[in-house]
Regions:
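Bacterial N-terminal signal peptides that target proteins for export
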Residues: 1-7
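Enriched but not universal
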Residues: 2, 20-21
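N-terminal signal peptide c-region/cleavage motif recognized by signal peptidases
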Residues: 15-16
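Accessory carbohydrate-recognition regions in carbohydrate-active enzymes
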Residues: 21-155
């Protein structure tokens, strides 16, 4: 009788694992919390203690770089401070994909959509149709630019 109870208990223990749902706690994280108002938390992907914090830089320029749509994007810079509430600084180098030639000095564009997740950012621009995806490693940021078939491919 005792062995039957132990066997039944072990079977129940192992079967309980098959009924458990795989829940990622990172799905509950919203990187936009604290990004507006005086918080100025940056929304881009980053690694814990990572050297780079890439994110879009919008016009007008808040400290964190990002503003909600429909504000236009000037480009993407590699270093942002988060939660300081001060003015923009650090002279970041801007990266901006464009597909309409080199005849303009600025290639500012509005976002068609935007997805912000923990460790990942993507947007597509309205005028150019270029999709930008960003993720990071501890010491580098990675970009993927997807251009429309018939456009020039410039950065």
């Amino acid at each position: 009788m005792k062995s039957k109870i132990i066997t039944l208990s072990v079977l129940l223990l192992f079967s309980a694992n098959t009924f458990a749902q795989d829940t990622k706690l990172t799905d509950y994280v919203d990187p936009r919390i604290g990004s507006e108002g005086l918080g100025r938390v940056f929304i881009g992907p980053s690694c814990p203690y990572g050297m780079v914090k890439p994110s879009p830089d919008c016009t007008p320029r808040p400290n964190s770089g990002w503003l909600p749509m429909p504000e236009q994007v000037d480009g993407f810079s590699q270093v942002h401070v988060s939660g300081t509430g001060g003015g923009p600084k650090y002279g970041n180098i801007l990266v901006m994909p464009f597909g309409d030639g080199m005849d303009r000095t600025k290639h500012i564009d509005h976002r068609k959509y935007e997805t912000i997740k923990l460790g990942y950012y993507t947007t597509q621009f309205q005028a150019s149709g270029i999709q930008t995806e960003i993720t990071t490693a501890p010491k580098a940021s990675f970009y993927r630019f997807t251009y429309p078939k018939d456009s020039l491919k410039s950065l």
